[in-house]
Amino acid sequence: MIRKAVIPVAGFGTRLLPITKAQPKEMLPVVNKPIVQYVVEDLVEAGVKDILFVTGKGKQAIENHFDVNYELECKLEKSGKYELLKIIKEIDRLGNIFYVRQKEQKGLGDAILYGEEFVGEEYFIAMVGDTIYSKNIVKDLIKAHEKYGCSVIALERVPKEDVYKYGVIDGEEIEKGVYKIKNMVEKPKVEEAPSNLIITGAYLLSPKIFEKIRETPPGRGGEIQITDAMNLLLKEEDIIGVEINCKRYDIGDALGWLKANVEIGAERFPEFREFLKEFVKNL
């Protein structure tokens, strides 16, 4: 049973400046909820209820969001706004939330390493805090882990010309949409990429990954890449990749954020979908 998750959220969100100058990108709204709430909801729905945020300077809004706000709850109750009160209380009850601060930003691998004491000797989920999926892929990772008994990562097939933006895998398909991974390359040149299957930022990892992160030398920009650590892990353990069968919203830049709001808004709010239809007609 997978009980724990680590969510690194210490990054500055520079590609979304100036909106992220004082606001964590993970707290930007997608329709009526902040990005990171979607991530936490998927984890809790999949049974992963102990969640560690690896934070940094200026991320207090995340802690405030998942904390109890007694003053607000009292005000809503006195005003008779019981539906809003119910929504707020549901956020308070989303799992068991813990925090640790990453003192220096040295890459995703280093951020995940901050979860070692929290995780202990268990397999765990690691997810980036700025990506939303149109279905619960945490359940898919857990299902694959239960079948194969090893680390599992989420994969997505992208156009070949886009592989330079991502970590890319070389692997053998062992059943439809499932790959036994041989190697991983971080942001390869298009002509050198081993495939067009990219790592999406959702991982189910063996606790042995912490040892491998410590063994991983810093790469470009002094960052410790989780892909390099997983390549070291591959020498001792299998890693399986599962191709996601859903939409992924990478909200790392303004266009991605806008797309997520439009598509998720149109899906969840019929009146907004009708507005969009009329709006597009008049463009």
Curated annotation (Swiss-Prot):
Source organism, top-level taxon: Archaea
Catalysed reactions listed for this entry: alpha-D-glucose 1-phosphate + UTP + H(+) = UDP-alpha-D-glucose + diphosphate
Keywords assigned: Nucleotidyltransferase, Transferase
A GO biological-process term: biosynthetic process
Family annotation (CDD domains): UGPase_prokaryotic
EC number: 2.7.7.9
UniProt entry tagged with the keyword Transferase: yes
Pfam families: NTP_transferase
GO function terms (MF aspect): UTP:glucose-1-phosphate uridylyltransferase activity
Leading EC class: transferase
Entry-linked SUPFAM superfamilies: Nucleotide-diphospho-sugar transferases (SSF53448)
Family: Belongs to the UDPGP type 2 family.
UniProt protein name: Putative UTP--glucose-1-phosphate uridylyltransferase
Organism of this sequence: Methanocaldococcus jannaschii (strain ATCC 43067 / DSM 2661 / JAL-1 / JCM 10045 / NBRC 100440) (Methanococcus jannaschii)
